[in-house]
UniProtKB/Swiss-Prot annotation:
GO terms for cellular component: extracellular region. SUPFAM superfamilies: C-type lectin-like. One of its GO terms (molecular function) is toxin activity. Disulfide bonds join C27-C38, C55-C146, C121-C138. This is Snaclec EMS16 subunit beta. Belongs to the snaclec family. Glycans are attached at N47. Expressed by the venom gland. It is found in: Secreted. The keyword Cytoplasm does not apply. Its main location: secreted. Residues 1-26 form the signal peptide.
Length: 154
């Protein structure tokens, strides 16, 4: 009997792994997983600093999202399209000293960009036919997206 239960459980684990259903199990309810990170789009509009503070309160290691490639950008844009009426949102890229030295709020490497124009804090805009980034004064209020690394031990 114990062996039958073990076999059934093993088959369930294999099924969930292959179906992708288990992929989101490391993220809290309401968050979505992509490439070992959890993401959540927040609709209430906040300025960049307030948005970053809210992200940091959500989960250990959570910050405004850093984007490192077109696949990640497409994933975040799908989340935004589902969650927001107006698909403009803060991401973690900023120029805090206004010296053209851009950095991610989570200290990730600045290795991908999709600029529309320049300086200060960065908004990602999702349109039906394109995705682009542009800079905006950090005091402006828009929606935002948070991100954190999942715990592989969970």
């Amino acid at each position: 009997m114990g062996r039958l239960i073990s076999v059934r459980f093993s088959l369930l684990v294999v099924f969930l792994s292959l179906s992708g259903i288990g992929a989101g199990l490391c993220c809290p309810l309401g968050w979505s997983s992509f490439d070992q990170h959890c993401y959540k789009v927040f609709e209430p509009v906040k300025n960049w600093t307030e948005a970053e503070e809210i992200c940091m309160q959500q989960h250990k290691g959570s910050r405004l999202a850093s984007i490192h490639g077109s696949e990640e950008e497409a994933f975040v844009s799908k989340l935004a399209s589902k969650a927001l009426k107006f698909t403009s949102m803060w991401i973690g890229l900023n120029n805090p000293w206004k010296d053209c030295k851009w950095e991610w709020s989570d200290n990730a490497r600045f290795d991908y960009k999709a600029w529309k124009r320049r300086p200060y804090c960065t908004v990602m805009v999702v349109k039906p036919d394109r995705i682009f980034w542009f800079t905006r004064g950090c005091e402006k209020s828009v929606s935002f997206v948070c991100k954190f690394l999942t715990d592989p031990a969970v």
